[in-house]
Regions:
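AAA+/P-loop NTPase substrate/partner-engagement loops
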Residues: 58-82
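Catalytic P-loop NTPase motifs of RecA-like helicase/translocase cores
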Residues: 127-130, 145, 160-161
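Charged, glycine-rich active-site and insertion segments that engage polyanionic ligands
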Residues: 1-48, 52-64, 147-148, 156-282, ...
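Loop/turn-to-beta-strand initiation segments
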Residues: 114-118, 146-152
Length: 360
């Protein structure tokens, strides 16, 4: 079952050992970056606990479809991006979350279809909503769930969770994946061609969920082509055109927005910045290719945007080696600033002005 999970050897080994030895914990907390497989692992482990024999059998399919009677999942909802008490407990009536839809409505009933009930709480950071009321409401349950029940929480970091929740769970850590592993999975399991897989593996920054999402988004790949054309134009444009190029860059950015699972943190703010952050990531990969070509030469450089090889070879001499390295550093610095809530318009205008200045 869990062998389907890519690159999370320690996490999978811990869960498999606990299952085989019959030493299961009542409450688990899966912690790691978004898009690395926490939710997928939670669903597969839930299916295994409920009697599934393989990733393809009927039990597993029902779990992933959200129709299994003994597996329930909840995640933050509404403008506040929190998990309310009404989403958890049936005694709290709410127009938006009626009692019969509360995740824990069947907690004290024996499983109906298999040996276990499993409750998955995605983006458990949302339990801090309402001054932690929802999180506090399940502390006793997390500490001493019924023998037939297991909880699996996912989060991007323990720092964003109530300490009292973390202390009641066994923490399982998930990490970023090497690009080579993501590339292999995209080709072997999802039918990507090698050039496409190489680009997506590099751009996903270690997040297999993001890579798969991007592979399924042809409009995003088309947006990448427009972005690289804009980058090529920016490399040759006069400095006076910087503001116009920055505006084009921001207008293009929404085409590069991806839907990545396992998102955590302040999702509302993050989603507003995500398109520009994605565009900057793609721009960084492009300049990384130029730097590799400039430093190592065409015969030895491993190019991520291999399908744009001719364009790269024509553009590699526009900047000096030193300027290319400075350009990459600048892009990463601008991206980091926007992640920390810097003004995206001012930041991108500065970026394109500086890129023009580096050309000399």
């Amino acid at each position: 079952m869990l062998e389907e999970i890519v690159g999370q050897t320690n996490a999978v080994a811990t869960l498999e050992h606990a299952f085989q030895e019959g030493r299961l914990t009542g409450s688990y907390l899966f912690v790691g970056p978004d898009g690395v497989g926490k939710t997928t692992t939670a669903q597969l482990f839930a299916a295994k606990l409920c009697g599934a024999a393989s990733p393809d059998d009927a039990v597993t399919r029902r779990v992933f479809a959200g129709t299994h009677s003994d597996v329930r999942m909840v995640e933050p909802a509404g403008k506040s991006n929190t998990i309310s008490v009404a989403q958890l407990w049936p005694r709290s009536e709410s127009k938006d979350h009626p009692s019969e839809r509360a995740m824990l409505r069947d907690l004290h009933f024996e499983p109906m279809a298999g040996p276990k009930r499993v409750f998955i709480i995605r983006e458990a950071e949302g339990l801090r909503g309402g001054n932690g009321t929802s999180g506090n409401s399940i502390l006793k349950t997390l500490e001493e769930p019924p023998a037939y029940a297991h909880f699996i929480l996912t989060a991007s970091s323990t720092a964003a969770l109530l300490p009292t929740i973390v202390s009641r769970c066994q923490v399982i850590h998930f990490g970023l994946l090497p690009a080579s592993e993501i590339e292999t999975v995209l080709i072997a399991r999802h039918g990507a061609d090698p050039d496409q897989a190489r680009f997506l593996a590099a751009y996903s920054e270690g997040r297999i969920g993001r890579a798969i999402s991007l592979l399924r988004s042809p409009e995003l790949l088309a947006g990448r082509d427009e972005l690289l054309d804009l980058a090529d134009k920016a490399m040759r444009a006069p400095q006076i055109a910087s503001f116009k190029l920055a505006e084009e860059f921001r207008k293009l950015a929404p085409k590069l927005k991806s839907d990545v699972g396992d998102a955590g943190g302040d999702e509302k703010e993050r989603s507003a910045r995500e398109p520009v952050l994605n565009a900057l990531s793609m721009l960084a990969v492009y300049f990384r290719d130029l730097t590799a070509l400039r430093v190592m030469g065409a015969s030895r450089a491993v190019i991520v945007n291999a399908d744009r090889g001719e364009q790269l070879k024509k553009s590699v001499t526009v900047y000096s080696e030193e300027a290319l390295i400075k350009a990459m550093s600048l892009i990463f610095s601008i991206r980091q600033g926007i992640e920390r809530n810097a003004n995206a318009q001012l930041a991108t205008e500065l970026l394109f002005a500086e890129l023009a200045a580096l050309r000399g």
